[in-house]
Amino acid sequence: MNNRPGTLQIYFQLMKLRVVILLQITALCAIIAHDLMVRSESIPGDRTWLDTLESCIVTLVGGTMAAGGSNAINMVYDKDIDPGMSRTRTRPIPNGWISPRHALIFGIILAISGSAVFIPIHWKAAFWSFFSVFF
């Protein structure tokens, strides 16, 4: 068993935050590209810079939470195979830094909360965020 990191670091490891950051960069690029196309009248729509900023903030917060929750749930699902692989044996659950039950509760709360962040923007965004947690 390795030296136990701090609690916050364990949660970040459960979320696979480095992977989520790459996902979020892609999402932000898509938002900005879309809104630039709207402003250049390449596609129909009416978006202000404030709309773009709001979409980016909501996507960063909600997307990070939903994807991080999904990753935590996946680590619980893989708890039986992670100890046997060199790449995954240092994850928080195989090391005993956090219980599978605790990680599952964290993942579910994070995924649901992250998906709920999208509700004020559009219910379809919230639906697809929640739906994607399971894939």
What are these regions (language model features)?
Residues 4-8, 12, 57, 109:
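Alpha-helical membrane-protein architecture signal
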Residues 6-19, 92-103:
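Interhelical loop and helix-boundary elements at the membrane-water interface
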Residues 16-34:
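The first (N-terminal) embedded transmembrane alpha-helix
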Residues 33, 37-79, 126-135:
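Membrane-embedded alpha-helical segments that form the functional core of polytopic membrane enzymes
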Residues 87-128:
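Multi-pass membrane catalytic core of lipid/isoprenoid biosynthesis enzymes
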